[in-house]
């Protein structure tokens, strides 16, 4: 059975600092699902690799420079959403250059994996919470 839903390709990062904190960004006002917390990233443009898209998006959104060689594949999300089907590879990144700032006016927070349940997130991100807790063996 084929679906008439559009396939949306997104690439996202789980940024982890030296203290094993995870960066969450809040979706800005005026964007779909505004106010929810998510892992930074964005849409993959035609002809662009997921890694190239992610390095571009992290610079555009957070003003940090990442190298494709420093992206470690973690998992992916394949989610049938209301109006589209989401396919999103996620990468763990522990190395970047620059100071993180929300260039689109979004708020961001460094949190422990044990705190992930306290932040409202888009439905496709929810299955990542236990995986991240297990990875970081948080609290």
Show where each model-derived region lies.
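Conserved Nudix-box catalytic region and its N-terminal flanking loop in Nudix hydrolases
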Residues: 21-60
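Conserved N-terminal beta-strand and adjoining loop/helix that marks the start
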Residues: 1-22, 43, 76
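Active-site-adjacent beta-strand/loop module that shapes the phosphate/pyrophosphate-binding cleft
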Residues: 8, 17, 75-99, 109
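Generic C-terminal helix-cap and adjacent flexible tail
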Residues: 2-5, 133-139
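NUDIX/MutT-family hydrolases
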Residues: 90-92, 100-132
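A short coil-to-beta-strand element that immediately follows conserved catalytic motifs
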Residues: 65-75
């Amino acid at each position: 059975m084929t679906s008439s839903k559009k396939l949306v390709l997104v690439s996202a990062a789980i940024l982890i600092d030296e203290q094993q904190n995870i960066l969450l960004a809040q979706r800005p006002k005026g964007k779909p699902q505004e106010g929810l917390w998510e892992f930074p990233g964005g849409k993959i443009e035609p002809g662009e690799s997921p890694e190239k898209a992610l390095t571009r998006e992290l610079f555009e959104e957070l003003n940090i420079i990442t190298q494709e060689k420093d992206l470690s594949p973690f998992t992916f999300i394949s989610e049938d959403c209301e109006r589209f089907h989401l396919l999103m590879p996620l990468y763990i990144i522990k190395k970047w250059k620059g100071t993180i700032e929300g260039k689109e006016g979004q708020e961001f927070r460094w949190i422990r994996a044990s705190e992930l349940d306290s932040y409202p997130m888009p439905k496709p991100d929810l299955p990542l919470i236990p995986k991240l807790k297990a990875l970081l063996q948080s609290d």
